[in-house]
């Protein structure tokens, strides 16, 4: 596993680089300025689902094991791919206390939430699909679309030091982002999807 992934609007990067990736609950409670990319009714559903620790999903920053999923497709269609970045996060966050793992998009009623050890075992059975570069097999299956959005739920926040790189749609976006990051003295690797990653490829 190369890492975990977080999908966000490029406009959120200054806050993320300074403070980290916050849970939705913390963003609300601290009135943090944030450009939302997800549909409100889906976010609200997450407030009504709970982990074994008694916390609802708003308590967690949610990371994907496979970023090339239907959630990314949805936000690209609604916000434009030039405004979206995928952050690769070190998989060391899996060792955090209180982490949970899901076998699909967490808000779905069919999705189960597991402890870290149980969840990693469950995802072993989905490993081939989660690591696949092919979009043809899952495009017509609701079950596989759901499973491709398996999540790692990290309590409260993901620290800036755990962010490894930013993946964007093309070289133009990468060049602009690199200038912004350099001026902030942030040494992170910016990768354009058309030269260093295929995450955005299906959406060209």
Spans of features found by a protein language model:
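Active-site-proximal loop/hinge segments that shape catalytic or ion-binding/gating pockets
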Residues: 1-62, 70-204
């Amino acid at each position: 596993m190369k890492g975990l992934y977080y999908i966000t609007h490029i406009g959120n990067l200054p806050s993320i680089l300074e403070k980290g990736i916050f849970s939705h609950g913390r963003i609300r409670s601290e009135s943090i300025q944030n450009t939302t990319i997800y549909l409100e009714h889906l976010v609200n559903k997450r407030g009504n689902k709970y982990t074994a620790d008694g916390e609802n999903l708003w308590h967690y920053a949610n990371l994907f094991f496979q970023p090339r999923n239907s959630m990314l497709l949805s936000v690209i269609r609604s916000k434009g791919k030039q405004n979206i970045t995928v952050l690769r996060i070190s998989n060391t966050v899996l060792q955090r206390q209180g982490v949970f793992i899901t076998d699909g998009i967490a808000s779905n009623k069919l999705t189960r939430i597991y402890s870290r050890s149980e969840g990693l075992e469950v995802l072993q059975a989905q490993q081939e699909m989660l690591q696949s570069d092919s979009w043809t097999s899952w495009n017509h299956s609701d079950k596989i679309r759901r499973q491709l959005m398996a999540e790692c739920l990290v309590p409260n926040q993901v620290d800036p030091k755990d962010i490894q790189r930013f993946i964007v749609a093309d070289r133009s976006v990468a060049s602009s982002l690199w200038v912004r990051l350099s001026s902030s003295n942030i040494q992170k690797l910016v990768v354009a999807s058309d030269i260093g990653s295929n995450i955005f490829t299906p959406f060209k």
